[in-house]
Each structure stands twice: as structure tokens, then as C-alpha cells.
Amino acid sequence: MGLLTGDTLGPLAVAVAIFLLLVDLMHRRRRWATRYPPGPTPVPMVGNLLQMDFQEPICYFSQLQGRFGNVFSLELAWTPVVVLNGLEAVREALVHRSEDTADRPPMPIYDHLGLGPESQGLFLARYGRAWREQRRFSLSTLRNFGLGRKSLEQWVTEEASCLCAAFAEQAGRPFGPGALLNKAVSNVISSLTYGRRFEYDDPRLLQLLELTQQALKQDSGFLREALNSIPVLLHIPGLASKVFSAQKAIITLTNEMIQEHRKTRDPTQPPRHLIDAFVDEIEKAKGNPKTSFNEENLCMVTSDLFIAGMVSTSITLTWALLLMILHPDVQRRVQQEIDEVIGREQLPEMGDQTRMPFTVAVIHEVQRFGDIVPLGVPHMTSRDTEVQGFLIPKGTTLITNLSSVLKDEKVWKKPFRFYPEHFLDAQGHFVKHEAFMPFSAGRRVCLGEPLARMELFLFFTCLLQRFSFSVPAGQPRPSDHGVFTFLKVPAPFQLCVEPR
């Protein structure tokens, strides 16, 4: 005879509901603390998940900022979140309290894909020994293989010439520039990680770029947040591997490429690229179970550097070309400065920047206006801290609304317009603003910032030295409103290229 009857089901349901409500209250008790940031009222069990606008989170956060101020709180299921808006709040958290806010929140979706505590890569790694070890290694290795040296500048310049040749083949017909930009930028980071470049029609490069685009789509939206906030759902067999199939495929493909390079490694010779250098560290660390130099992390660090090194720079260059066809007067001024300083025959060099204030200002304004990582990468407090007078307890996820800094009406004269004069003084000299932080700030500032700056200047000036860009005849003017996933990318558009 069954134990659950009509007479027992009702009381049991009530008991379960009361228990869950008590658990929910226990998780939310921090909201009652003095000086905890205000925020919208959460719904039991799911918090503010159902209220979030995952398609336009920047607009949603702007509305909440208007209601609650520059520091407000959310509850994503049982995950406490504090959103920081405006220069003062973001700078205080990331720079002045960087030791308290340098951690990353746990990401159960990645743990479920088989990544262990010593194999978290770089960008989502928890703040601690393993992260310090890998950041130190990556910075020193990138320097050893050319970052800050003439050799890397030559790699970028040579790749820019290949890119210009590919653009020249498109002359006379409309085309979308994103695919070619992805390939060119990928080859720069590939030279550092794999010691080689790919031909633009190489099947493996095309596969890697396609998987990267899929991964970016999978890595945003409601489902990702729901699975991270309610990780018990990840125990549904096969769910994580299916929902995040592109990430798994990238790991597999990266591992294949790593193994191919390891077969040609001569241990008696200096390392040829980052993979060789990492393998040397694995050999040195043998017998140490706590080291972050292991086979799994080799794959994670390599894929982290490749994806981050490619995506952000290529998207920024796509924004640059879009804004040039929308603002032909700015394009002409950049070309005039290139002609006066470099000429049309000599290749651009990084040393030219000091004599090209308008071009440098345009590149900075592209980054500000494009605002490609509007919400940054999430941080987490590693101990109780304060921001703008609010108490933020240990273990709170922090979202740094970088868009609110790059578009702050108190800082920028025309925050929602493309206006290179933001970075020029009255005499036409370049000036940099403290509110310019597209690479974030503090201890977790993007380690690839110097490389990105080099690529942006050299690719952009090479392209505008060789070509003029325009909206294709008969096509409507493209929109300069971006499309948000995890990143903010231009809506699909085409342009025409004309050799100068």
C-alpha cells in the first residue's frame, strides 16, 4: 500500500514548501545586513533571474542604476550579485580594493566539462597561486617571444600585408570584413602560441573560428546563468556537453594541435613558442600534484590566449571599419595624417604613433564607442569589503558595468556619439582619460593589452593607408548599435573597398 495518499500529499507539500522557503530565506539573509546595496525584490528560489533582460542587460542595468544608484544588488537564484556602475565605483573596487575583488566566481558549467582546480586556464581562474603562476608565465613567455620587441611588430606588419592582399581581392564588390579580420588577428596569436600562421583557407583555422563563434553564443543568455546559478541542473546526463558543445569541441581541437607540436619538439633546443615553454614547465613540475603546469591546463591556457587574443581585437577592428564608412570625414582625416607622417609606400611602425595624434585618438574612440565587453568579466569578493560606503560580503559576485564608465555623461562630452575629439586637447594633442578602461583595470586587467594596442594601430593604419572604405551603393546606411551576446559586436554589414 502506497505511503503517499491524498491525506498525506497535502501536508507533505506544505512541509516541503516551508522548508524551501526557509532555505531561501537563509540564502538571502545578507540582504538584511546594514549597508548592503539595495536592489529589486527577488522572487523566492529564482531570485531576479526571471526579471533579468539577458538580451539587453545594459539597458536593464541602466534602469536599475536610475532607481537604486551606482551600486545595487541582484539575486540570481541563490547567487548574490552586486553591480558596480560609473567611474568612481568601478575604480574603487578594481583598483583601490583590488586584493579584495580579484577573485572569479565559481563556474559550475566549466567544472562539469571536466576542468579541475589546477586546470582553470587564465581568464576564469580563481584568484590564488595557480592564477598567479599562469599569469606570470604567460606574461614572461609573451615577452620572450616578441611582445614589446621588434620581432612581434614585424609579425603583425607581415600579417597586415597579407590582410591587405586579401582585401584587395574583394575590390569592386560588397563584402563583410569580419571573417578576414578574424583570420588575420588569429594568425598573430597563433604565431605566439603555435609558432606558425595559417593560410586564410586552412580548414583547421576555419573550424577553430567557427567553433569560437558558436562558443560565444553558447556562453551567454538565460540558460548559461540558470545552470551556473542552479548547478544541480548540470547533473542531468549529457546536458552540459550538449549545451556547451562548442567549448568541448574547442578543447578537443586544441589538444590535437598541441599533440602535433609536441611530436616535433626537440628538448635540446630553446622553446619555439608558448606550447614548448609550457611543456618545459610541465617537465620541471613533475611530482608536484599542486602545480598548475599540467596537460589539462596547457590546453586551457592555450585556448584562453587564442580565443581572447583573437576575438576582442578582431571585433574592435570590425567596429573601426564600420565607423569609418559611417564617418567618411574622419576616415579622410586619418588618411591625410597617414600620408603626411608615413606616406603610401612605407609600412607603418609603432614609433609613428607619437606623430599621429588624430589616428591614435580615433582608435581610442573606436574602443570607447564600440564598448565590446560592456559588463567586463565577473569578479568575486575574497573577503568582506566596502565600495562607495556599501558593505559587500565575501563570496559576492561583482559585475563591473564598464559601459557605464565608457559612456558616463559626467565624463564624456558626447558619450553616445562617435567623437574622436574626446581624446584630443584644444591644440590637437592626444590625451587619455582615466575613464578609458576597455581592458578593465586592477589585478585582473587584460594581460594582452600591449599586444592588442599594437595590432589595432598597425592593422588599422595599414588598411587605411592602402584603401578607402564606403557603404555599398544602393544599400542602406548600417546601424552603429551593437548586438549583445557576452560581447557587443556590430550588426552584420557590408562595405566596399577601393585601392588608393
Curated annotation (Swiss-Prot):
UniProt xrefs under CDD domains: CYP2D
UniProt entry keywords in alphabetical sequence: Endoplasmic reticulum, Heme, Iron, Membrane, Metal-binding, Microsome, Monooxygenase, Oxidoreductase
Top enzyme class: oxidoreductase
MF GO annotations: heme binding; iron ion binding; oxidoreductase activity, acting on paired donors, with incorporation or reduction of molecular oxygen, reduced flavin or flavoprotein as one donor, and incorporation of one atom of oxygen
Tissues expressing this chain: Liver. Also detected in several other tissues.
InterPro entries the record matches: Cyt_P450, Cyt_P450_CS, Cyt_P450_E_grp-I, Cyt_P450_E_grp-I_CYP2D-like, Cyt_P450_sf, Cytochrome_P450_fam2
UniProt name for this protein: Cytochrome P450 2D15
Organism field: Canis lupus familiaris
Upper classification of the organism: Eukaryota, Metazoa, Chordata, Craniata, Vertebrata
